[in-house]
Design a protein with these regions (language model features):
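Extended, hydrophobic alpha-helical segments
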Residues: 25, 37-41, 96-97, 123-128
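Alpha-helix exit/C-cap motif
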Residues: 14, 39-58, 94, 98-107
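N-terminal single-pass transmembrane signal-anchor helix
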Residues: 1-18
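Acidic, glycine-rich loop-and-strand cores that form catalytic or ligand-binding grooves
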Residues: 58-111
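Short, surface-exposed interaction loops/tails
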Residues: 119-183
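Proteolytic processing hotspots in large secreted/extracellular or virion-associated proteins
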Residues: 110-120
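Membrane-proximal amphipathic alpha-helices
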Residues: 23-34
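Charge-biased, low-complexity intrinsically disordered regions
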Residues: 7, 25, 55-58, 114
Length: 183
């Protein structure tokens, strides 16, 4: 009986996997931050008529295209001098809090990357490299077109978000380096 209970206890503890649970919690938090960033960009665009990485609504003056860019406090607008996060935070439109900027720019944070191809009607994507197995699997499934994800949208940053084997659905194991992207 004691051996059986010991075996069950080991099985339950193995199934819980505290490291995986911590990584999943961090990935969930990072995904929430990505959602907040996308929402702030959308609100800024709705208010100003151009993206925060632009200096004006005129595409001949300021290109709306945003290459795959790491989101950091020193991220500067295209052709300008202002910090994009500064324009979104209390120093600008107040779409995000200064504490949000400090958190996503901190050392040890799983940094966000943002992308928009600049075409009318295209989505803005906020991406990160997941740490938990479940988020890594989801990122790989999306990149390789498996499961319920289907085909990637035409404006999705495939080259940057799905490097190496991330688009290969024949692999026996999840590759590292696939980005989890929203929306």
């Amino acid at each position: 009986v004691i051996t059986l209970l010991g075996t069950l206890a080991v099985a339950v503890l193995s199934a819980i996997n505290p490291v995986e649970q911590m990584n999943r919690s961090r990935d969930t938090s990072t995904r929430s931050d990505a959602e907040q960033l996308i929402n702030a960009v959308d609100r800024y665009y709705a208010t100003k008529g151009f993206y925060p990485w632009q200096t004006s609504a005129d595409p001949t003056i300021s290109d709306p295209t945003l290459p795959f860019t790491e989101v950091r406090a020193d991220w500067i607008e295209n052709g300008g001098d202002d910090s994009v996060l500064g324009k979104l935070s209390s120093g600008g439109a107040a779409e995000i809090k200064e504490s949000f900027v400090s958190r996503i720019d901190a050392e040890g944070y799983n940094h966000l990357w943002i992308y928009n191809d600049g075409k009318q009607g295209s989505s803005t994507y906020a991406c990160f490299i997941p740490k938990s197995s479940s988020f890594k699997d989801d990122a790989w499934y999306r990149c390789s077109g498996q499961g319920d994800f289907g085909e990637l949208p035409a404006d999705f940053p495939v080259t940057e978000a799905c490097p190496g084997d991330c688009t290969n659905d024949d692999l026996g194991a999840t590759p590292d380096g696939c980005y989890s992207c929203l929306p």
